[in-house]
Amino acid sequence: EKLDIPIPMAWDRSGHRVSGPAIAMGAQMFDAAGEPALVDDGLKEMTQRLYDWHQDGTMSKELWGSVSGSTYLGANEDFANAQVVMYMSGSWQIPQFADKIGDAFDWWAVPAPCGAAACTGMPGGAALVAMKDTKHPAEVGKLMDFLAQEESLAEFYGKTLFIPGHLKLATGGVDFATDDPRAKHALQTFSGAVPTISSVAFDLQGYKNNRVMFNALISRLNEAIVGELTLDQAYARMEEDIANQLAEKALE
């Protein structure tokens, strides 16, 4: 109120973004057989909070409510224009915030929120892979071996401002090439969180049909937030959506 900022908090409108805090709250995402099991007590606890925050004004219905279905919507422009106090997003935002915000105001990254089960976000990002059908396997192998060396990775991460997947480098082995102290701190904060990422989050990120789960989660949760469904109805629809889409994929 003192700063006249209209939106206390915003999150990326995506199932991927919501899944990390849900896992922190105890969501398991899969059953004992490894099959998708999205709705459990952990997921309900996190989605209930998101629902409540939208009802009491902590989060703005106008942001998530401005799109439908599984459409992604970020709040990066609102945050860069000082219209949001706290923004839950990914490390890919850091370079553009350093460029767009500069020193217009102080912005500061904090670790992923903790729940009863973990302090975790979701892994993700880009990957450089070798194709098995290359006509030059020996040369490609040498290149990949060079790029995978700790020194090479440190230089690559430092220049590209990517968060390292290498656990040793993630705990302080990268000198990020930016003069912006806020961006450097943000990159170090995200890097330091890599070792604490939950195994459930890695399993979900690696699941080939995770998009089915992400889309069902965000689309049905949003319908509850804007008043089209109750939360209990949204949970039932999430499970129906996932079952139907997986059945369709099995026929492809």
Located regions from the model:
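Beta->alpha turn/N-cap motifs
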Residues: 89-94, 126
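Bilobed periplasmic-binding protein-like "clamshell/Venus-flytrap" ligand-binding domains
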Residues: 1-12, 61, 149-160, 244-252
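C-terminal capping/gating helix-and-loop segments adjacent to ligand/active sites or protein-protein/ligand interfaces
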Residues: 185-241
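Extracytoplasmic/periplasmic substrate-recognition and gating elements
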Residues: 55-59, 99-168, 199
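Extracytoplasmic/periplasmic solute-binding protein
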Residues: 1-45, 51, 75, 84
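Paired acidic/hydrophobic, glycine-rich loop segments that form the ligand-binding mouth/hinge
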Residues: 85-90, 108
